[in-house]
């Protein structure tokens, strides 16, 4: 039996036990892409990871050149501040950029920062919680009432993609600046987003290859965790990044290690699978839909995060970390307007 047959066999066993957890109405699934649908937006980026958009046409891209990179409408990339370990990116209702720092990447701190792109001011929102310095802030998300949520993936080591240690958590920064942990005991928690009504917070659990959501309370706390949709592919206990990268490309295509997530306006949750070079979506009725796969690294080489932009929110931007580029495609369904955009 080949390695691929073993992986696929494991997938069939695992996926059969994961029925869709949510049925919330008739689904309008997104149309799949071909690689020719993508065009290059920016290349030459140093380890880009997160991305967010502004109604004025600018993009905010985390990369090694600064605390945040601002891609202006004329194509100029303006770096602000000093890079720590910039990772996930969001924008608050006032247009300030929220950057999570994955300190484990360079054995440094992993705080959550807020950046005023007009003045260049960089401030630290959270550097420690419950007496412990943060080292793995990963994916932030903002709500229209001023709440900020962020994932903290683990305490290390960084290379254990399939970690079986549930040491990750989600923390919240209230509008008054107070920070607290609102969800615990998560395996490799990563990307984060809210739905249209901001009733639920959704997170990708990389090590489990699935999405989980929590009901959001009036005080910002999170309750009632539920797995959302099917498992997204093969996952292996304590799977190491170096071993994943050594796998044949065809075998990596089946991996379900999920990263960035974002909703479109029809309620489809788009998910990047960086090790598989794949983007999928979970429909409102709980089905997984394949959007695009790039087995040869032509346009998508470790796609980590995505966002919508453009005047009609139909420009989908995807960060391709391994190749240091951002690419764009037009979608048939617009993206969900986030906290810094006018509500639809």
Report the location of each language-model feature.
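N-terminal export signals
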Residues: 5-22
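A short helix->beta-strand "capping" segment at the edge of beta-propeller domains
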Residues: 27-44
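A short beta-strand motif characteristic of beta-propeller blades
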Residues: 37-42, 76-81, 123-129, 178-183, ...
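Beta-rich, blade/repeat-based domains predominating
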Residues: 43-56, 83-109, 129-148, 154, ...
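Short loop/turn segments immediately following the C-termini of beta-strands
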Residues: 64, 102, 153-155, 206, ...
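A short loop-to-beta-strand structural motif that recurs across blades of beta-propeller domains
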Residues: 67-69, 111-113, 169-171, 210-212, ...
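Short loop/turn segments that connect beta-strands within beta-propeller blades
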Residues: 72-75, 116-120, 174-177, 217-219, ...
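Blade-level signature of beta-propeller repeat domains, shared across WD40, Kelch, NHL, RCC1
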Residues: 309-344
């Amino acid at each position: 039996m080949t390695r691929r047959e073993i992986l696929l066999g494991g997938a069939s066993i695992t996926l059969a036990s994961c029925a869709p957890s949510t049925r919330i109405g008739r689904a309008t699934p997104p149309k799949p892409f071909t690689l020719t649908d993508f065009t290059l937006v920016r290349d030459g980026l140093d380890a880009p990871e997160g991305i967010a958009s502004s109604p004025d046409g600018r993009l905010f891209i985390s990369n090694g050149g600064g605390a945040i990179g601002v891609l202006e409408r004329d194509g100029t990339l303006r770096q602000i501040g000093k890079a720590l370990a910039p990772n996930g990116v969001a924008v608050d209702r006032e247009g300030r950029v929220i950057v999570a720092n994955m300190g484990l990447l360079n054995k440094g701190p992993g705080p959550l920062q807020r950046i005023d792109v007009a003045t260049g001011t960089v401030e630290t929102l959270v550097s420690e919680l419950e007496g412990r310095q943060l080292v793995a802030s990963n994916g932030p998300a903002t709500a229209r009432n001023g709440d900020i949520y962020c994932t903290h993936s683990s305490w290390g080591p960084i290379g254990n993609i399939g970690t079986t240690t549930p040491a990750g958590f989600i923390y919240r920064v209230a509008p008054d600046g107070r920070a607290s942990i609102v969800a615990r005991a998560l395996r490799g928690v990563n990307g984060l987003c809210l739905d249209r009504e901001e009733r639920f917070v959704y997170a990708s659990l990389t090590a489990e290859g699935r999405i989980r959501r929590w009901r959001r309370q009036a005080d910002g706390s999170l309750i009632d965790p539920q797995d959302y949709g099917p498992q997204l592919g093969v996952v292996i206990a304590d799977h190491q990044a170096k071993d994943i990268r050594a796998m044949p490309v065809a075998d990596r295509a089946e991996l379900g290690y999920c990263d960035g997530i974002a909703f479109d306006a029809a309620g489809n949750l788009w998910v990047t699978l960086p090790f598989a070079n794949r983007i999928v979506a979970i429909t409102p009725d709980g089905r997984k839909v394949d959007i695009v796969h790039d087995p040869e690294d032509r346009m998508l080489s470790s796609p980590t995060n995505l966002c919508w932009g453009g005047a009609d929110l139909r420009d989908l931007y995807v960060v391709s970390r391994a190749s240091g580029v951002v690419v764009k495609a037009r979608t048939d369904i617009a993206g969900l307007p986030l906290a810094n955009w006018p509500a639809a």
